[in-house]
C-alpha cells in the first residue's frame, strides 16, 4: 500500500527520488508518468481508465480549441466523469467501486484549467498525450491537491535540477511536520469529533462546542498536513508546488479565509468561475451574485449533499455581506475581535460541512443552545478518549500547531532559524522533535486523509 500516510509511501518517494536524479532531465517526465500511474493504479485501479480516457479526450480537444464546439466538447469530456461518478451515484444512492473515485475532483479541475488556458492563449496545446496525462495524474496532488497549473508544473520537469542536500533536508523537515499534524493533531481530534457528531443529543453544550471547534482544527491539521507532506517530497525532487495554506485561523474576514485556506482552489474558482461571470467589474448586486454563485460551485465540488451546498452558500453570502460593511477601523483589539469572529463563522460553517445531514447539523446547534452542563472539563471518556493523558496530548498538539502558525504569521521562519544554529544545538532540537513526534503521534487506528474523498 502506498497511501500517503503509510510507510510504503515513504519508501516509494525515496525510490523515486533516487531514480529521479539518476535519470536524464529530458526523460524525467516519463519516469514521473510511470510513478503517477503506479501510484493511482495501486490506490484506485478501477478508475485508472477513466483518468486516462478523460485526459485523452481533453488532449484531443485541446489541439482544436479554436473551434468553440470542440472546446465545449472538451469541457464536457473533462466534467463528465465527475458528474457520472460523483453526483449521479450520490443522487441515486449507488455504492460501488467507481462511486466517488479517488481524486476525481482534482484531476477534473486540472484538466478544465488546462483546456481553458489553451483556449485563452495562455499556453500552447500539448503535443504529446502522455505529457498531459502526466500532468493530470501527478501523484503528489491527485488525491488532495494542491491544484497545479500546467504552465507552472510541466516546465519544471524538463529543468536540469541537480541533487541539493540542503534542499532535500528542508523537504524532509516539511514532510515530517505534515506527518506530525496528521498523526498528533488530526487523528487525535478525530476521536472526539466522530463521537460528538454521531449522537449530538447525548452531549452537553460544552462538549458540542468542543466537537465543533475540534472538527475545524482536525480538518486544518489533516489537510494542511497532507499539503506539507507532498510539498516536502516535491522539494526533495526540486519541484516547486503551490502553497495551499497560510495560517487560516488568523484570518480577520471571510474573504481573508479564502486567501489563506485551500488557496489553490480559491485561485481556481477566481480564474475559471468568478472572473468569467464578470468578477468585480460590474454592479454591486451582480458582484454579490457572482460571489454567491462561485461559492455554491465550491460547495458542489466538495460533494453532492445539501450540507456542502449550504456551506458554500454561507461563505458566498458572508463575503457578499462584507462588501457592504463600512471601512475597517484600526486597532489591535478590533483586529483580535475580527479574528475571533471570523473563526466562529469558519467553525460554524464547518459544522454543517461535517454533519451527515442538515438535520444532524441542526441537532448539534440546538444542543449548543439548549443542553446544559460542562462535562467537557471532566468526563473525557464520554468523548471517546481513553485516558486523561490522551486528552492532554490532544491539547498539547493543538498548542504546538497554533504556536508554529503564530510564528509564521509574524514572519518568523522556524526552519531558517534552526538551520542557522550551531550543529550541536540544531541536532539537539531535531532529536527533541523526533521524541515529541514519537510520543504524541497516534500511530494505530488513524484514518485516511479527509480531503481524499473530494
Regions found by a protein language model. Give the residues of each.
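Membrane-embedded transmembrane alpha-helical bundles that form the catalytic cores
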Residues: 1-453
Amino acid at each position: 500500500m502506498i497511501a500517503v500516510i503509510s510507510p510504503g509511501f515513504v519508501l516509494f518517494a525515496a525510490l523515486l527520488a533516487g531514480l529521479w536524479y539518476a535519470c536524464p532531465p529530458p526523460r524525467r517526465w516519463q519516469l514521473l508518468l510511470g510513478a503517477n500511474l503506479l501510484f493511482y493504479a495501486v490506490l484506485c485501479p478501477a478508475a485508472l481508465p477513466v483518468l486516462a480516457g478523460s485526459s485523452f479526450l481533453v488532449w484531443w480537444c485541446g489541439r482544436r480549441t479554436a473551434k468553440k464546439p470542440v472546446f465545449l466538447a472538451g469541457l464536457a469530456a473533462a466534467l463528465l466523469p465527475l458528474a457520472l461518478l460523483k453526483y449521479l451515484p450520490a443522487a441515486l444512492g449507488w455504492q460501488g467501486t467507481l462511486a466517488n473515485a479517488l481524486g476525481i475532483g482534482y484531476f477534473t479541475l486540472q484538466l478544465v484549467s488546462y483546456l481553458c488556458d489553451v483556449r485563452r492563449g495562455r499556453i500552447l496545446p500539448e503535443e504529446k498525450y502522455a505529457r498531459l496525462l502526466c500532468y493530470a495524474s501527478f501523484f503528489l496532488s491527485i488525491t488532495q491537491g494542491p491544484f497545479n497549473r500546467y504552465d507552472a508544473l510541466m516546465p519544471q520537469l524538463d529543468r536540469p535540477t541537480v541533487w541539493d542536500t540542503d534542499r532535500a533536508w528542508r523537504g524532509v523537515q516539511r514532510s515530517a511536520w505534515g506527518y506530525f499534524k496528521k498523526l498528533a493533531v488530526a487523528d487525535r481530534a478525530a476521536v472526539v469529533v466522530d463521537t460528538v457528531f454521531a449522537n449530538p443529543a447525548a452531549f452537553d453544550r460544552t462538549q458540542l462546542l468542543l466537537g465543533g471547534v475540534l472538527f475545524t482544527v482536525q480538518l486544518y491539521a489533516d489537510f494542511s498536513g497532507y499539503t506539507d507532506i507532498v510539498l516536502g517530497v516535491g522539494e526533495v525532487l526540486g519541484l516547486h508546488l503551490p502553497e495551499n495554506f497560510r495560517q487560516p485561523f488568523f484570518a480577520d474576514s471571510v474573504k481573508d479565509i479564502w486567501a489563506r485556506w485551500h488557496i489553490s482552489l480559491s485561485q481556481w474558482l477566481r480564474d475559471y468561475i468568478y472572473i468569467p461571470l464578470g468578477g468585480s467589474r460590474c454592479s454591486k448586486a451582480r458582484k454579490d451574485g457572482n460571489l454567491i454563485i462561485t461559492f455554491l460551485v465550491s460547495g458542489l465540488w466538495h460533494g453532492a449533499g445539501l450540507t456542502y451546498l449550504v456551506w458554500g452558500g454561507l461563505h458566498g453570502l458572508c463575503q457578499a455581506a462584507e462588501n457592504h460593511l463600512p471601512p475597517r477601523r484600526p486597532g489591535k483589539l478590533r483586529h483580535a475581535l475580527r479574528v475571533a469572529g471570523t473563526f466562529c463563522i469558519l467553525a460554524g460553517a464547518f459544522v454543517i460541512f461535517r454533519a451527515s445531514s442538515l438535520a444532524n447539523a441542526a441537532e448539534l446547534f440546538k444542543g449548543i443552545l439548549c443542553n446544559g452542563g460542562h462535562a467537557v472539563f471532566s468526563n473525557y471518556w464520554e468523548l471517546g478518549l481513553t485516558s486523561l493523558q490522551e486528552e492532554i496530548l490532544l491539547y498539547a498538539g493543538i498548542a504546538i500547531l497554533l504556536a508554529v502558525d503564530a510564528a509564521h504569521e509574524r514572519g518568523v521562519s522556524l526552519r531558517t532559524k534552526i538551520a542557522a544554529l550551531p550543529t550541536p544545538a540544531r541536532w539537539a532540537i531535531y532529536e527533541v522533535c523526533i521524541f515529541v513526534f514519537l510520543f504524541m503521534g497516534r500511530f494505530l487506528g488513524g484514518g485516511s486523509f479527509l480531503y481524499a474523498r473530494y
